[in-house]
Amino acid sequence: MQKGTDVVLVTGATGHQGGAVARQLLSQRHRVRALTRKPQGEAAKALAGLGAEVVPGELDDGGSLEKALRGAWGVFSVQNTWEAGVEAEERQGKRLAELARKAGVSHFVYTSVGSAHRRTGIPHFENKARIEETVRGLGFPSYTILRPVFFMENWTSPSFNPSLAEGKLAIGIRADTPLEMIAVEDIGAYGLKAFEQHAELNRREIDIAGDEQTMPETARILGKAMGRSLEFAPVPIEEVRKFSADFAVMLEWFDRVGYDVHIRSRSREFGIPPTSLADWAAKAPWR
């Protein structure tokens, strides 16, 4: 990868993962082409201010993808399950990979999900496993698959946990279940590594995490960062199922099996210090 010459197309550039990867690449003076549906939005303007080339595009619009891929050396591919839905996410991920291969992209980085390869039975894990299969089979000169676990950023999302305002961490996970988590900035660091060390990481499939905590301990850590008392409030899984069958299956899998990242050894291998939940929470934008 030639710094200042090779262009990396980053999809989801104004979202959590894409934004983190774009910022990391830009911090090392790499050329970033940021794909977004809202090129005039504040997040896109912020990336442009850091030096990114912001281009409009939709993952469901093959024409805009073909245009964005022209001359790209690398691609960072991310899709949003909760926004697009399981079937659309799979379609988008496969199409982007196929178009990137057709466009002559040299290195393709796909961000999947932790344990996607383990036959979890979770719909939004299984569809990513099928996208992974597509990436493997296309014959890219090189590719890397990243598999991040549960995002720490989920805790600051009102739609994910509205009960935080009531002093409760409400989720359908057992009190004694340890949950592996990762800060999106750590994903960005691994994304940067995947591009800068593309030869060494060719065909590597890497599960990544930064910390592991039970829900009562998570409530204690988040409450301390928020400056208030926060109580873990377990939610019956059948109540979760009424909201989302997919989400319920995932939570049941967390209790029964769970992610399996060796955090310390992974950190040592890649030279990326893991962000702890406490460190992340201390800097999080609590409202």
Regions found by a protein language model. Name each.
Residues 8-11, 53, 163, 254, ...:
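Compositionally biased, low-complexity repeat tracts
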Residues 51-52, 143:
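Short, conserved active-site loop motifs that form the nucleotide-linked donor/cofactor pocket
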Residues 57:
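Cofactor-binding loops of NAD(P)H-dependent oxidoreductases
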Residues 75-77, 259:
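Short, basic/glycine-rich phosphate-binding loops at helix/coil junctions
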